[in-house]
């Protein structure tokens, strides 16, 4: 993809003052030469003002007012998942490119409709799975292609976190909270990244907290048509885990901190073959910065990779299958 180095920066407006925007996305947008934050909207003006005092741009009260601005070319959407479909649609119809936090929507039909709107208007809609832009995964894929563990027999991935405070948005099912949409989408997306487009749902268990009617953990089993399985674990009532592992015909390969590595973290690839073990230390990278750069380059070049939308739609199908096909366990 061409790097439009001499292009004017994309003027970005932010809809929603979420924690992920404050900690990760806005610092990356501010540091990226191809983007300029021109406006930040919140339903509360004082909250928008606090964000702009740190990251620049104009504070805007209310999301519709931001979409009416002429100084906004693209919109970043870090809202709760249940609000994504409405505000992505409104942003696209206002002529803005959109970078939306994962999950893009809460189901595949909504995602299909939004990508259709984007195509009709010649706009980019990108789901921000930032971990996909870290080079460590390409390096792992290259090692696997070289046969470091033989033929891949199975894949396992886990992303679990300890319980959050009682009022945390993850426990609010009415705004798209819950472990599946907030956390489970990561191992599902990793399975698709490495095992390909023919992944199928086999089974799942979702553990619901009865009082709040929210999913707090789960496991899913997927398979390729050749019988390579993906065993996925996710939850928010666990010890912290953040890893994936491949088992092959002659060995295994695994890594930790695969989904949310800090920008200064040097990933370590572990490989075991019979009585032989080795480690490879990979360079540190800022995956948020790389995600922002990929979005900006695609907007400025006009090249909107079709595989991005196709991957997002396959992901949405798998998440839908896990949600609707799972055995639901309620406690206490």
Swiss-Prot record:
Its EC number is 1.1.1.384. GO terms for biological process: antibiotic biosynthetic process. Changing residue 186 to F: Same affinity for dTDP-glucose and NADPH compared to the wild-type. Small reduction of the catalytic efficiency resulting from the conformational flexibility of the nicotinamide ring. Substrate binds at residues 24, 240, 260. It is an enzyme of class 1 (oxidoreductase). Keywords: Antibiotic biosynthesis, NADP, Oxidoreductase. Changing residue 102 to A/M/Q: Loss of reductase activity. Gene3D superfamilies: Dihydrodipicolinate Reductase, domain 2, NAD(P)-binding Rossmann-like Domain. Pfam families: GFO_IDH_MocA, GFO_IDH_MocA_C3. The active site is at 102 (proton donor). NADP(+) binds at residues 17-23, 42-43, 63, 79, 84, 170, 182. It catalyses: dTDP-4-dehydro-2,6-dideoxy-alpha-D-glucose + NADP(+) = dTDP-3,4-didehydro-2,6-dideoxy-alpha-D-glucose + NADPH + H(+). Coiled coil: none annotated. One of its GO terms (molecular function) is nucleotide binding. InterPro entries: Gfo/Idh/MocA-like_OxRdtase_N, Gfo/Idh/MocA_domain, GFO_IDH_MocA-like_dom, NAD(P)-bd_dom_sf. Pathway: Antibiotic biosynthesis. PANTHER family: OXIDOREDUCTASES, TRANS-1,2-DIHYDROBENZENE-1,2-DIOL DEHYDROGENASE. Homotetramer; dimer of dimers. Belongs to the Gfo/Idh/MocA family. Involved in the biosynthesis of L-digitoxose, an unusual dideoxysugar attached to various pharmacologically active natural products, including the antitumor antibiotic tetrocarcin A, and the antibiotics kijanimicin and jadomycin B. Also able to reduce dTDP-3-keto-6-deoxy-D-galactose and dTDP-3-keto-6-deoxy-D-glucose to yield dTDP-fucose and dTDP-quinovose, respectively. This is dTDP-3,4-didehydro-2,6-dideoxy-alpha-D-glucose 3-reductase. The lineage of its organism: Bacteria, Bacillati, Actinomycetota, Actinomycetes, Streptosporangiales.
């Amino acid at each position: 993809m061409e790097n439009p180095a001499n292009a004017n920066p994309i003027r970005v407006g932010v809809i929603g003052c979420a924690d992920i925007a404050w900690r990760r996305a806005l610092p990356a947008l501010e540091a990226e030469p191809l983007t300029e934050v021109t406006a930040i909207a919140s339903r509360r003006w004082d909250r928008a003002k606090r964000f702009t005092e740190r990251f620049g741009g104009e504070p805007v009260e209310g999301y519709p007012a931001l979409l009416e601005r002429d100084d906004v070319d693209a919109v970043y959407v870090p809202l709760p998942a249940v609000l994504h479909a409405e505000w992505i649609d409104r942003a696209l119809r206002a002529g803005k490119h959109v970078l939306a936090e994962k999950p893009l929507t809460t189901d595949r039909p909504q995602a299909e409709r939004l990508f259709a709107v984007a195509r009709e208007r010649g706009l980019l809609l990108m789901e921000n799975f930032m971990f996909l832009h870290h080079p460590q995964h390409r390096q792992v894929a290259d090692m696997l292609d070289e046969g470091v563990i033989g033929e891949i027999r199975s894949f396992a991935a886990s992303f679990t976190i300890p319980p959050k405070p009682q009022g945390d948005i993850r426990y609010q099912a009415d705004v798209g909270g819950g472990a599946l949409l907030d956390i489970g989408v990561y191992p599902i997306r990793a399975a698709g990244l490495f095992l390909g487009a023919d992944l199928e749902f086999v089974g799942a268990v979702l553990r619901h907290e009865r009082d709040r009617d929210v999913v707090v953990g789960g496991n899913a089993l997927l398979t390729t048509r050749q019988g390579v399985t993906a065993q996925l674990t996710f939850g928010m009532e666990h010890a912290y885990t953040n890893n994936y592992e491949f088992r092959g015909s002659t060995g295994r390969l695994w890594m930790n901190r695969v989904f949310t590595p800090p920008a200064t973290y040097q990933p370590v690839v572990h490989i075991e073959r019979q009585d032989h073990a080795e480690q490879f230390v990979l360079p540190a990278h800022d995956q948020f910065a790389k995600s922002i750069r990929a979005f900006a380059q695609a907007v400025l070049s006009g090249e909107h990779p079709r595989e991005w939308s196709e991957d997002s739609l396959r992901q949405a199908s798998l998440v839908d299958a896990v949600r609707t096909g799972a055995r639901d366990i309620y406690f206490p």
